[in-house]
């Protein structure tokens, strides 16, 4: 392979030439559709935003969860779905929709491991949005653990998450 020579001085003028154009995930191109919701996450490098996508397909009510998620995050998805099943009448969701369709929840950037309870409210909102076909504003982001009774519990990393929201121009 051919090597290119670069100046050893890194500055704003040559950083893109050396490293390439930065990849920004501060915005999601198809975020204003039912079932797609913005969440806030804590990482070892600070706060970040993530997107939860939900989809339905014909089936028997099976739940699939993808995106390199850990055990706690998968449990949050199960809790979200069980809350919806228990409260389908109050949410104006037909129970038939839940039993005659498979539900898929995906958190993009599958190469990045993700875990923790704080995406629970985002998963719940994504599913309710999908089932009711009501879109969630793209400039709305959320974080919080949910319980089977629908309570939102406090989570950590709030300062970092707020800074991530600000970087993503979420008010």
Locations of regions flagged by a protein language model:
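Peripheral, non-AAA+ core regions of ATP-driven protein-machinery
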Residues: 4-15, 19-38, 44-171
């Amino acid at each position: 392979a051919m090597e290119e020579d670069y100046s050893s001085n890194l500055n704003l003028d040559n950083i893109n030439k050396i490293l390439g154009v930065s990849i920004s995930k501060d915005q999601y191109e198809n975020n204003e559709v039912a079932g797609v919701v913005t969440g806030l996450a804590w990482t070892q490098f600070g706060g970040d935003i993530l997107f939860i996508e939900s989809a339905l397909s014909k089936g028997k009510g099976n739940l699939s969860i993808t995106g390199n998620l850990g055990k706690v995050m998968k449990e949050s998805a199960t809790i979200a779905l069980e809350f919806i099943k228990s409260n389908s009448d109050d949410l104006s969701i037909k129970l038939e929709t839940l039993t005659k369709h498979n539900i898929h929840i995906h958190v993009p950037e599958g190469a990045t491991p993700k875990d923790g309870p704080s995406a629970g409210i985002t998963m719940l909102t994504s599913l309710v949005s999908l089932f009711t076909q009501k879109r969630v504003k793209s400039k709305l982001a959320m974080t919080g653990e949910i319980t089977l009774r629908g309570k939102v519990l406090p989570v950590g990393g709030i300062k970092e998450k707020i800074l991530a929201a600000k970087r993503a121009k979420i008010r």
